[in-house]
Amino acid sequence: VEAFVAGVDRGRYRTILGDRAVTAMKARELGRGNIVVGDTVNLTGDVTGAPGTLARVVRVEPRRTVLRRSADDTDPVERVIVANADQLLIVTALADPEPRLRLIDRFLVAAYEADIEPVLCLTKSDLAPPDGLESILAMYKPLGLSYVVLGRPLSHAVLDSLREMLAGQVSVLVGQSGVGKSTLVNALVPDAARTVGTVSPVTGRGRHTSSSVVALPLPPPGGWIIDTPGLRSFGLGHMSAENIVAAFEDLADLTADCPPDCSHLGPECALDKTVPSSAAARLDSLRRLLHSIEGTELGTEPGAMQAESAEDAEDDEPGQS
């Protein structure tokens, strides 16, 4: 029988079969292949879900989409975070903590590479500085992104609009700690009981409150929301430079005048002339990413830097290779 993987914990899988949860383990014949939240699996054995019972996962169905990352930008080994997602909700606070635009760009690259629809979810609008919201929306306007803006307290009207966007979809929440992901999940799934964190007054960063990836069913008309641990980094070392450029959809078409095999990092690159000034920050972000996956930084020699995405060694590591 088919079931949906809603959680993974030390070799045990919480699967949803109809209206019941069934704990399962992976059959030996599946080998070392990993099972992640969002996977559709086939179960055999005791699938009653009764306490103390354990079913077996004997097959993992082909994945429609795969959201992945690497440990850092110099590590080519990919880690699968979630399977079969339809949407990626990029949750970003407009203040407390300050928005990290280059982290948003990394999430966007991962979404486009996985063929997952990205959605900007901008929180704490009540704390936003003047023009803070408008500047972010203007930067990403060329991408035609869907977006939702949330203040505190959360508006019922905005939540209703977000519920319509999530209905019938498998949606993943990503963002750094402290941006309001857990608050949002608790509002959308009343019995979720996700722990709400705070922002450290010393570092200005959020404290981790969710330690694992978990899928939660949305109330009717249904759908799934997948919460992930707060991320301070998001490695893209498994991606080629060509694919990263292609994921910057607002800039990719402007590379037509670049010379063959252009790295987009040197003086011969045509992007310096074709990219409008309004997109200068996006071009800077692209080039920082390209330098990072090469192990270099603007103005440095190869190997002279730690990858930007590995800036926090204590970062939680959702997903598996």
Model-derived features: positions:
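Phosphate-binding glycine-rich loops and their immediate beta-loop-alpha structural context
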Residues: 80-84, 91-145
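Structural detector for short beta-strands of small beta-barrel domains
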Residues: 1-9
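Helix-rich effector regions associated with P-loop NTPase G domains
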Residues: 33-54, 59-81, 85-87, 110, ...
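Beta-strand/loop nucleic-acid-binding surfaces
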Residues: 21-35
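A conserved segment at the C-terminal end of the G1
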Residues: 181-194
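Short strand-coil-strand connectors
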Residues: 16-18, 219
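Short aromatic-glycine-enriched beta-strand elements
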Residues: 11-15
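Canonical P-loop GTPase G-domain recognition
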Residues: 127-179
